[in-house]
Amino acid sequence: MDDMDRLIAEAKKRDMYILMDLVVNHCSDKHEWFQKALADPDGPYAGYFYFREGKDGKAPSNYRSYFGGSAWTKVPGTNKYYLHTFAKEQPDLNWENKELREEIYKMVNWWLDKGIGGFRLDAITYLKKEAGLPSYPADGEDGLVSVAHGALNQPGIEALLREFRDRTYGRRETLTVGETAGLTPETLLSFISLEDGVFSMVFEFSWCQLELKGPNYFWYDRQEWTPEDLKRELFSSHEMAGDRGWFGVCTENHDQPRSIDHYLPREGRNYYGATMLASMYLLLRGTPYVYQGQEIGMRNCAYASMDDYNDVSTHNQYNRALADGFSPEEALRLVQLESRDNARTPFQW
């Protein structure tokens, strides 16, 4: 913590502020809260999470996590399951629980009191879950359905986030950028309004996976796209918001492949193509975010073996492709195109 205090202080001497990544949709399964919940299923900490009884020897509902397989993991020795939108090591926090919310607000204000300048709010549109967490018709051969049906951008999410804002960062001068998957054109402006937005700005992702078919975005379920498609998706939100809202603009992040390989045809993956991509997003209205390595035009890693990939979602997507009839070579090629590890390599000096 001494290092962090020094970083904040030295940054302020230079008229700079530190933004932190704030993850409050879920926590680690090693977190003290979750361990206490497991130790005492009827205790107060169990209410911090989504524990549900299984049904007929199966999970409480048929949600598929974003990293593959059921979004419910069984607690050993019981008939209870816990919900995880992402990996099983990341149990979702129950924001309907008032005590949980108070703990989060206390933690956020503690960091703000230390002098943090603001936050990137991770997976923030997943905080509100559908009441009852019901099953839906399956959307795949595995009999499951995307967890988004019960967890993404649910009614009431804006009211919940406004309470969050008003109890924490909204009380002081801060900068906040929301990772806001699932926002619709009808709700976008209320999140980024310069007058009363939930956040200072949001990342807008509608154009980041044009090559994949929703809502599951399986890497093998691909579609063709054109520069006109990119232009339409890229500009539509900006045209709608006009001068009433503000965006965080990016073409790369830790969840996406490198933009040179992602958006440019093979013959355009050079200095001129990279300069064009940079011009495209640096000239948009908003605050540009340059992802690590993007400033030197880093490329996808394209490893030759699955043994070289670490990302859990990459291995799940690879296995999913194999299960649906793709050869190991075809599945590996999909991984080389889409893996999150493409953006997580050391600097390519």
Segments from the language model and where they lie:
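Active-site and adjacent substrate-binding regions of carbohydrate-active enzymes
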Residues: 1-349
